[in-house]
């Protein structure tokens, strides 16, 4: 007994002594940990002077008196992880997540042999992943995510950690391939590897991790194909491989993953069909396939999955939306936007009682919106924008008692906006780009939840009522491009939450209400293109948060307010300020007068200033140079005087500077050479003098420079040749002297060069003639001499103007240099030569006149022969081939006449080639005349248009075509080769088009189906759009065709289309677009607005082109008896009626109907309907039309 007592006491004291030593060591380690921190005060409870045990300190947990857990997450601890932590021998959990630790993991940590949980996520740790992890055999949970680890995954990670059940290395900078040893982790259930730079294929050994439940590796660089062994993961519940360039199809073997609940393959560059085998995944709740290139229909087998979420946006899925969707009884979100689904929206969607989010935007859906859509009342967000939906929305959404967002933009919905929409809990209502008519219901403004209401590009009319002030929650109101009238109500000032107000392109009148200044949250105010009058209220421009102010195209008068928004006065550019509509100040096209306020120079965050086309006077304030963020400054079209401030060279971000059409004088500042970002510089039509600064050669980004119509002088600097991106250089009508620098031949991007009407001398540099991209060269009216170089553009009279240089010689100017070089030494010899020539001409003319009179007597009784004789009577008149003109950048230029008669062809050749304009050679009728086929000597076939005398507009048409076609060269425009004018006779010579007109093929050509198939029709649509887009946008001034129709689309031997017959075309100058009292166009193609206004626009051409697209897709004429029962009695009305009835497919030409081509045909129909919008402002421009057609 005594022995046992002694043994017990010995063991007790021995254990106590050991424990005391261990406890002292642990306390020391914890204190060392604290002291190593850069902010130790955050662990204030760790204090050895207190009576509390270290086991009671924050984050410390003990078992049997020893530390087994240290958990200090999200405390903002800073510093490096101290190696002393390895002294905590019994530690099983170490969690330092969500702090600010940096540096590497100390290797001593691997001495913690009992460690089961290691969480170092959310810090700034660096270095390679430590290979010594294999020294922790009991590790179950490892989280190193959200750090800065680099390098590859060491195979030892997977070989020596057999117990590991969760591994997270996501959001680091790891790279390389995944080693096949990953298959050794037989107990792993969670594997997170995303947001790294891993590459290669996922190893097939992944299938050996039999217990894996969650596998997430998004946002890496894995590629396909995916290993079929994934199907062996029978416990897999979540698979996320999104945002990887897999470039493969979805494996059919995924259908064997019966426990799969979440499948996320978003933006994985997937191709092929959605495999029907996915229907075997009976546990699948969330299927996310958006942003891929999947095609085909939705497989029926998906109907058997109890999905909560199905997203497949931005793919190429097609077919109709299946009615079996109604089987998804627990579906919460259905997102199928940006695909190619067609047909009607199935009413069975009402059978999805849990559906909250429905997005079917940007498809080819047609017909009316089914009233059953809101049958369950659960929908909270509906997006049907960008389809072909038609009909009205009366009572359609009455049952949507939970609806907070309704987006219907860019459809063909008509009728009025329902009165009862205000009863819904709507926060966003977007109705842009439809055919809504009538007034905006007053009841809508009673909505207390409405934060966004947009209805631009419709045909809404009426006025804005005072009740608008009741919509207190409204933040965004966009009603641009409608027909709203009246005054802007003062009550709009009550909308203190309003951030964006856009009423552009309406018919509002009166003054801008001062009360708008009470909308203190306004960031964007756009009242442009209305009929507003009066002065700009100071209270508006002083709005503290105003970032975009557009009041252009009104009748505003008075001076510019001197205290713009406080937002503009910020010292630094705020965040997001480079987004669209930030820092814009546009007051152009008004009647504002007085000086530009100096205070504008204090608005340091202004990005764009446009004050053009007003009546502003005085000098340009030097203070504008302080606007260091300015990218565009347009002060053109005013009455500004004085010199250009040299300080403007400080605006280093300036990309566009337009000071044209003012009265500025003095020199061009040398400091302009500092504007390294400048792309376009326009100083035309001022009174500038002096030389062009050599410093402009520093403008390496400049593409267009116009210094024309000034008094600039001196020699042209060779430094201009360093502007390597220059496309257009215009310096005509100045007083430049000296020679043209040959260094300009280094400007390989140059397309337009005009140095005409100066005092330049010397020879034409050969290098300039050989510029590879030069389309137009105007050297006319200088003092140039010598032989014209035989290279490139100088030998092309359609591209080079050389007239007015008397000492030039060579074939192209019709003067032989050798003959001209042999001087006649005797003045008597010259006089004798001239006298002899005169006698010869006199005798010839006298004889010809006698012969003609004799013939006229013989033919007096034959009208047809009299016509032939009259034509033959001027056979000595020359048929001149045109020299080209050029397009140019300034807003307005004078019409360029054709000063270079070349390659003379006798009219007799034309008369003979057409057999005296015989009826058998007629190939068509153009505007105001008949077109004949003619084969000239040399086997050149041309088309000759003989303008009719009976047409009172014949001379106008002739001049219009001359002015237009002589300046334009494009592969999709018919080239005008020559012309002749004698008395009342006028002839135009065009290139001959073998396949005639589109009109001929669509209606008269036998065997049309075999030849004019869908691919050719699409080719014709794209080519014709390309030609018309060039007329509208290829250069300034723009060109309106005014008579676009199928007979004016000609086809060459390869069915490449070319736009023809510019008989009604006219150049638009800066403010000229009115036609004569004669309505332009051809019946069936005339836009509706031409019957109400004398103003011709490019949007009128777009409408006519929309009719041509309809002809191509339907095979029908624009007018005819087939349309008697249709609205408007024409093809357009018939097509709209069919589409509104949900029968868009019936519009397609029956000869072309094909399941494979239906989507592209419906897409062309959709583009046509956009072009045919009744309101011009709703129509796209031709560049947008061309882009859309090319994407089919």
From Swiss-Prot:
Receptor with a serine/threonine-protein kinase activity required for the specification of the correct number of male archesporial initials and for the subsequent specification of tapetal and middle cell layer identities. In seeds, required for enhancing cell size and the rate of embryonic development. Its main location: membrane. It is a single-pass type I membrane protein. Some ecotypic variation may occur: in cv. Landsberg erecta, meiocytes of a null mutant fail to undergo cytokinesis while in cv. C24, cytokinesis clearly takes place, with the mutant meiocytes degenerating shortly after the tetrad stage. The modification Phosphotyrosine is found at residues 990, 1085. GO terms for cellular component: membrane; plasma membrane. The chain crosses the membrane at residues 828-848. The gene is EMS1. ATP binds at residues 923-931, 945. This is Leucine-rich repeat receptor protein kinase EMS1. It comes from the Eukaryota. Keywords: ATP-binding, Cell membrane, Glycoprotein, Kinase, Leucine-rich repeat, Meiosis, Membrane, Nucleotide-binding, Phosphoprotein, Receptor, Repeat, Serine/threonine-protein kinase, Signal, Transferase, Transmembrane, Transmembrane helix. Changing residue 104 to N: In exs-2; male sterility. Gene3D superfamilies: Phosphorylase Kinase, domain 1, Ribonuclease Inhibitor, Transferase(Phosphotransferase) domain 1. Interacts with TPD1. It catalyses: L-seryl-[protein] + ATP = O-phospho-L-seryl-[protein] + ADP + H(+); L-threonyl-[protein] + ATP = O-phospho-L-threonyl-[protein] + ADP + H(+). It is found in: Cell membrane.
